[in-house]
Amino acid sequence: MWGFRLLRSPPLLLLLPQLGIGNASSCSQARTMNPGGSGGARCSLSAEVRRRQCLQLSTVPGADPQRSNELLLLAAAGEGLERQDLPGDPAKEEPQPPPQHHVLYFPGDVQNYHEIMTRHPENYQWENWSLENVATILAHRFPNSYIWVIKCSRMHLHKFSCYDNFVKSNMFGAPEHNTDFGAFKHLYMLLVNAFNLSQNSLSKKSLNVWNKDSIASNCRSSPSHTTNGCQGEKVRTCEKSDESAMSFYPPSLNDASFTLIGFSKGCVVLNQLLFELKEAKKDKNIDAFIKSIRTMYWLDGGHSGGSNTWVTYPEVLKEFAQTGIIVHTHVTPYQVRDPMRSWIGKEHKKFVQILGDLGMQVTSQIHFTKEAPSIENHFRVHEVF
């Protein structure tokens, strides 16, 4: 059964000073990143963050009703698109929403909802990169965009993300790529169903929103749990916001454009999409969806398999080059300079080289080269890409 619930996470405040959001001087207490702790600092959030709603969509089916994923949506608000009529003014026509941009993000291993990560004996170390926190980072990176975090369908041992609905995978989520698994069909229908599900949820005056009062001033610690409050060791309840000054347009596929981002294990989804391009284009709806994809980001891709971390098949990349999609790769020494997994760096170099030779617009950047390879820097690629 489809469902949704609001998510609010105090650790979002911990990342705001690093991202340049809000008043850093007033957030000194929030700079200390302790597992599950929300600090207690009251930060002045930027207008962009205040105007966003976070919605968890559970059990959203794809092309096959038996294959579903959870999605986390951080919605963009209409900026200056709704006129507040003065008393006595004649009724005005409802403005048409502008074309929307949607960012689709596929997380890596261990990434989960903040509440789950803080309770795990090992994964709590990486709670700053929870699904909610990364959604906020992406919202800052892609302003005025709808941020969709597409959660893997299975997490082996609570660590290894497995995208079984997008690509044939082994127990630990290492992919076995082919040309007809149906990743594009699943993604397209997943979005269609998620958009429909969120239509009413994100309409005006339907939900509480993140604003300066609900996040900063009116979030109070409470020992009890609430679905409407901020999650953490101590749940913080948020009062209802002033909805009259805000306008939220529901997600729409009409004239929409897309950015696809894979991080670490999440890159296996992007790779599978490349393998399916030729066949997927035969479906007119999916072909239209492919043409609406503007950019794809590979962020430090990696998985537990012994090869195929990056796509290096010329015939597959030739088909990809014909799409005109802009490609960005951002990597760290943790992946591409690991002597025990030397194929990753070689495959990455070949991926970029072949696409460049095919005339595709592709950029490649390696980060943290002067620092020792670490998982922390692997995650920090979110901050610098």
From Swiss-Prot:
Keywords: Electron transport, Mitochondrion, Primary mitochondrial disease, Respiratory chain, Transit peptide, Transport
Main location: mitochondrion
Protein location: Mitochondrion matrix
One biological process term in Gene Ontology: oxidative phosphorylation
GO cellular-component term (any): mitochondrion
Family that this chain belongs to: Belongs to the C2orf69 family.
Disease field: Combined oxidative phosphorylation deficiency 53: An autosomal recessive mitochondrial disorder characterized by global developmental delay, hypomyelination, cerebral atrophy, microcephaly, liver dysfunction, and recurrent autoinflammation.
Role according to the record: May play a role in the respiratory chain.
Name of protein: Mitochondrial protein C2orf69
Species this protein is from: Homo sapiens
